[in-house]
Amino acid sequence: MARIEHAEIFMVPLDPKVRRVDAIQSFVCQETIILRLHDADGATGTGYSYTIGTGGSSVVALLVDHLLPRLLGSDGDGIEAIWRDLYFFTHATGVGAITSLALAAIDTALWDLRAGRVGLPLHKIAGGAKSRVPVYTTEGGWLHLPQEALVDDAHRAKADGFHGVKIKIGKAHVSEDVARVGALRRAVGTDFELMVDCNQAFSVDDAIRRAHALDAFDLGWIEEPLPADDLGGHIRLAQSTAIPVAVGESLYSIGHFREYLQQRACAIVQVDCARIGGITPWLKVAHMAEAFNIDVAPHFLMELHVSLDDITTSRLTIKDGYAEAPQSPGLGIDWDWQAIARLSLITQSVRKAA
């Protein structure tokens, strides 16, 4: 039984590779919080979390001042026990972003540590359900892009083997969204998935109106049409449209997902590994969705995000429209520690008290 003795924390700001504009904001920075745990046997595990430009230093402070002092000295194999202990330890601070993002950094590091110790890739020790998953692209679908650019990107994505594209909607007039989606459907045909993402921009009535206007285009889903805390609105929308409603990236607890699933307020669950608090609760949500016969399409899957290219040397393998699960032990990420040290705005170390 090897106990956790030492932790290193880095916060690295990463600029987006392309300009990103949706219905509510423009992305300017990804604050990446990287946590490296060392156990008494000399083994290490690295996890990470992220923010969209705000709050990264608060996540670091919660880790350094409260969570890591409680973690150090624990048996690194007790992942479930550690997650539950830290979850309830922080419960009084409220279930939400800062707490969940900090928990995720610890939890993913522990999974990486365990997988590395047994010499297996993460997807194997998490159950090994699939060795590859179909992929779609969002990078050409931002709201500021002209219609012609959306069509060109969709053509390239289809030629490259992607299974679909997702674009942002939320133009001032419904007719603009309809024109853009219609142009895409005509360009790629009916054998290619199209999804739309609203980024919580609409009222209930506006979302219902836009869903009806887009119904003819056989959409794979309409994502985050309403504010995430509007459960009743999602119930109304789900009952009024044939388009599958996707939610989850802005839900921060298992209980929130339970409510959506019990009320049949969504058809696609997009649980985010960082925002839910790590791999441990992510798996709980995925299995809960399975019990309701609801599909899972993960949001912002942590090891896939292209911005990490600046601080990693490994790359995801995509072949014939499928992302192949990494086969190396752990998360499958080769971190560039020199780049991390060079780019980090915050670097801290926490050791177990003597």
Question: Where would I find each of the regions flagged by the language model?
Answer:
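Flexible C-terminal active-site loop/helix
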Residues: A2-D15, S26, L301-A354
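Metal- or metallocofactor-binding catalytic centers and their adjacent structured scaffolds
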Residues: H6, H38-R117
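Short, P/G- and charge-enriched loop/turn segments at secondary-structure junctions
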Residues: R19-Q25
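Short beta-strand elements
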Residues: I33-A40, S314-I318
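Conserved, mostly hydrophobic/aromatic
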Residues: G42, L67, I106, G119, ...
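Metal-dependent enolase-superfamily TIM-barrel catalytic cores that perform enediolate-based chemistry
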Residues: K124-G127, S131-S240
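Shared catalytic-loop signature of beta/alpha-barrel
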Residues: H212, D218, D229-Y322, P326-P329
